[in-house]
Design a protein with these regions (language model features):
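A short, structured loop/turn motif at beta-sheet edges
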Residues: 42-46, 97-105, 131-141, 175-178
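Hydrophobic ligand-binding cavity/cleft-lining segments
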Residues: 16-65, 69
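Hydrophobic/aromatic beta-strand elements that line small-molecule binding cavities or substrate pockets
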Residues: 37-39, 91-98, 125-134
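Hydrophobic pocket/interface hotspot
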Residues: 48-49, 58, 76, 96, ...
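A conserved amphipathic terminal alpha-helix motif
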Residues: 18-20, 147-178
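Short beta-edge strand/loop motif at the mouth of beta-sheet-based domains
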Residues: 56-91, 99
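Bacterial Sec-dependent N-terminal signal peptides
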Residues: 1-24
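Beta-strand/loop substructures that line and gate deep hydrophobic ligand-binding cavities in soluble
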Residues: 116-163
Length: 178
């Protein structure tokens, strides 16, 4: 009986963790905020990478309209509104600063008109760094860290918006495996 319980922990526990987005945000020693979210997907590293780097897979979870040009200096463009196109001004365009295949994807976050002009003018360092860590041949940890936040009341509101929005988005990703 003891071995059955141990087997259940070994085989079931990793899949239970895959059902949650864990907020592990923190403040660095220099006082900078890091919005950090972690989740474990019950899929291999190559499949997890494709969820972030192919149009078809992005459209399953990030937005109904999504396109990626995977290269340094490339971009991801999305639109959450099914009545609009990627050419519409409401689309969100994230520049790909760099990537290391199946390990790292760094995106430049450019705030749109949903945010105050002040934070839009100060968003030069705002980035999302996405890490892909192989836990096993059938399990991949995703760590999303947003860095480059400003320090004001308006920036606090922007940070809070992304806490809610990013948790929601990564929960949408996890729903593919529930």
């Amino acid at each position: 009986m003891k071995y059955l319980a141990l087997a259940a922990l070994v085989f079931i526990a990793p899949n239970l963790k895959a059902q949650t987005v864990e907020n592990t945000s923190y403040i660095t020693k220099t006082g900078e905020k890091v919005l950090r979210l972690e989740s474990v997907l019950p899929i291999g590293l190559q499949e997890a990478w494709q969820l972030f780097t192919t149009d078809e897979q992005l459209q399953k979870w990030i937005a109904p309209f999504a396109h990626i040009e995977l290269r340094t200096g490339g971009y991801i463009i999305t639109n959450y509104d099914k009545t609009k196109s990627l050419a519409d001004s409401s689309s969100i365009r994230l520049q790909i600063i760099n990537y290391i295949e199946q390990q790292l994807l760094t995106l430049k976050v450019k705030l749109n008109n949903n945010f105050s002009k002040t934070v839009q003018n100060e968003d030069g360092n705002l980035q999302e760094v996405i890490q892909f860590i192989q836990v096993s041949s059938t399990s991949t940890k995703i760590i999303s860290s947003m860095i480059g936040w400003g320090d004001s009341e308006e920036w606090s509101k922007t940070y809070d918006f992304f806490v809610r929005g990013n948790i929601y988005t990564y929960e949408e990703l996890l729903k593919l495996y529930k």
